[in-house]
Design a protein with these regions (language model features):
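Contiguous beta-strand/loop segments that form the cofactor/metal-binding neighborhood of enzyme cores
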Residues: 1, 188-270, 315-329, 346-349, ...
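N-terminal Rossmann-like dinucleotide-binding module
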Residues: 1-57
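C-terminal helix-rich "cap/oligomerization" subdomain common to oxidoreductases
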Residues: 1-11, 17, 77-82, 131, ...
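Intrinsically disordered, low-complexity Ser/Thr- and acidic-rich flexible linkers and loops
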Residues: 4-7, 80-94, 283-286
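Short, Asp-centered acidic motifs that coordinate Mg2+ and/or phosphate
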Residues: 41, 61, 77, 162, ...
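Conserved SAM-binding strand-loop segment of SAM-dependent methyltransferases
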Residues: 59-66
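Beta-strand-loop-alpha-helix segment that lines the small-molecule cofactor/substrate pocket
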Residues: 77, 88-140
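Predominantly a Rossmann-like dinucleotide-binding segment in NAD(P)-dependent oxidoreductases
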Residues: 139-210, 356
Length: 363
């Protein structure tokens, strides 16, 4: 992707921002350098923090009441990055609906809600108001995952037959899963691997959880509606020095691997066959047009592609949403439809282990 700098866009979206915490400060506000965003106002319950954010990121005004900001400012779009309430539930549904009813498009960070019912309500209000909502499922925008999506969509890759993924997350014991406060970490993180699985494998038909009671790790068997088989390894218990994630997708005669979110290896279809027991060198089965392809960024040059804002999907997800809004289009990825399935999957995880749990259609 070729990147346009903020000042190069001929038109920009008048933007407000609710939330001035550490995550927003590090990872979301800085993306506006590369998006068609005119940051007009920011809001935080802590007025000092709001004033600081306004000063650092160039907002004209700051507020400690989001309703006051919505009433006073002429905005096109609001970004919302907040924490959970006292019950452990994300604050996004109410805040997003307030913004939608004010006639504004909305970008919210993940996790977008604590229930699929809250997602359905946001879908209803979004449809009612004609305003779009995007959700920060950043892993749908990792360059390695986007490239993987491109490769598996090619006819020569064949239909996806199986997917395996690894993510270091603990699933709380069943007796704790009814308490949203004890599920905060799981809800916050489980959307990461499942958003990638949705991007690459499509909707899920059911999951089956086999959990280890000692540390809360699990092997999750998955059936995609396409018929592909899936396996998600929740690998808590691993060393803190270990790599965190791995993904493999197998088609029909080809496969690819994404390691540590940046290293992609595409094992292409072999165009020759070697009789077993007759090959004297390991290059015999490979031709230049069928050897594996390998990608990994360099970390020497001062490029955008090796910045965390781009490698971790933050800038690409913001650029996608804002540029499509300028074109009068809805987001393609990180949609409320994506969010609906991910919350239905989260609800399935809250049920007892060792049982197949169907995932409802995300219609």
């Amino acid at each position: 992707m070729l990147v346009t700098y903020n000042h190069e866009y001929p038109k920009q979206l008048r933007t407000g921002f609710i939330g001035c915490g550490g995550h927003a400060y590090r990872n979301v506000y800085p993306t506006f350098q590369y998006a068609p965003v005119n940051l007009v106002a920011v809001c935080d319950l802590d007025p000092v923090r709001a004033a600081t954010c306004a000063k650092v990121f160039g907002a004209e005004r700051h507020y400690s009441d989001h309703l006051e900001m919505l009433a006073r400012e002429e905005l096109d779009l609001v970004f919302i990055v907040t924490n959970v309430d006292e019950h452990g539930r994300p604050r996004y549904p109410k805040l997003a609906i307030d913004c939608l009813r004010a006639g504004l498009h909305v970008w919210i960070e993940k996790p977008p809600a604590s229930s699929s019912g809250e997602i359905r309500e946001m879908i209803r209000v979004s449809s009612e108001t004609g305003r779009h909502v995007a959700v920060g499922f950043k892993k749908m925008f990792f360059p390695a995952n986007v490239k993987a999506k491109e490769i598996v969509s090619r006819p020569e890759f064949g239909p996806i037959t199986s997917i395996t993924a690894r993510y270091p997350q603990s699933l709380p014991p069943f007796e704790d899963r009814g308490d949203s406060r004890k599920m905060v970490s799981f809800l916050d993180h489980i959307v990461h691997p499942h958003s990638v699985l949705r991007l690459l494998g499509g909707p899920i038909e059911w999951i089956f959880v086999n959990r280890n009671s000692a540390v809360g790790s699990a092997i999750v068997s998955i059936r995609f509606t396409s018929g592909a088989a899936g396996n998600l390894h929740l690998s808590t218990g691993q060393s803190s020095t270990s790599f965190l994630e791995r993904l493999e997708i197998i088609g029909d005669g080809e496969n690819l691997v994404v390691e540590n979110n940046i290293r992609l290896i595409h094992y292409r279809r072999s165009k020759s066959k070697i009789e077993y027991g007759r090959s004297g060198d390991y290059f015999g089965a490979l031709t230049d047009d069928s050897a594996p392809l390998y990608w990994e960024p360099e970390f020497s040059l001062g490029q955008l592609y090796n910045k965390g804002l781009f490698l971790l999907g933050y800038a690409p997800e913001v650029i996608q949403f804002t540029t499509r809004l300028l074109d009068g289009k809805a987001p393609v990825h990180g949609t409320l439809k994506d969010a609906l399935e991910l919350l239905q999957i989260y609800e399935a995880y809250r049920r007892p282990d060792g049982i197949i749990h169907p995932i409802k259609e995300s219609s």
